[in-house]
Amino acid sequence: MAVTGWLESLRAAEKTALLQDGRRKVHYLFPNGKEMAEEYDEKTNELLVRKWRVKSALGALGQWQIEVGEPALPGAGSLGPELITESNANPIFVRKDTKMSFQWRIRNLPYPKDVYNVFVDQKERCVVVRTTNKKYYKKFSIPDLERYQLPLDESLLSFAHANSTLIISYQKPKEVLVAESELQKELKKVKTAHSSDGDCKTQ
C-alpha cells in the first residue's frame, strides 16, 4: 500500500533530532541524497515547518524549498534568494497545517467570500482557487496526498475568508492521520539533542 511505502521510506531515512526554542527539529537524509527538515511544536506535536533540499547533478546542495510554514524573514540567518521579500500588497501564499487538516492561507485578498471559487481539478490532481472578478487565480497540489497516493476528494475541501485572508482547509484522510500518528511514535525513538548539547548526532 502506498501509505505504508512512504512511512517505510521515512523509517529508513537517517534521522537527527534537536530540541530548540520550544520546537522539535527533525532532519531526514534519504538514501537518494534528498533531505527533508521538519519542525514540530514540542507540546502539541503540530507540524510547523517542512522543507526539502536536493543535490544538483554536480553534487552541490540546492536551496531549501519550503512546503509547510513561513518563508524565512530578512535578517534571519544568511542572505539568500528565499529572503527576497514580496510586496506587502501582493497575495502571499503560505501553508500552515493543523492536527486535522492541511491548510493554506492566502493573504492580501480583500474581496468578499462569495467572489471565491475553490475546487478540485481531478484531471490535474490539484486544488484551484479563482475569483469571479478575475483578479486572482492559483492552483496547487497537495504533496502529502501524492506521496501517499491518495485521491483528492472535494467533499474534504472548505474555505473561509477573514481579515483579507482566504483560508483553505482540506480535511486529512484517515490514512494520513494514522500514518502521522505512526511517524510520531517513530520519532520518539530518535535520540533528541538539546540546543545546549551542541551538534546532534545522526542515528
UniProtKB/Swiss-Prot annotation:
GO cellular component: extracellular region
Chain ranges passing through the membrane: none
Any one biological process term the GO annotation gives: lateral ventricle development
InterPro entries: DPCD
Similarity annotation: Belongs to the DPCD family.
Function: May play a role in the formation or function of ciliated cells.
Protein known as: Protein DPCD
Organism listed in the record: Bos taurus (Bovine)
Lineage, highest ranks first: Eukaryota, Metazoa, Chordata, Craniata, Vertebrata
Chain's gene name: DPCD
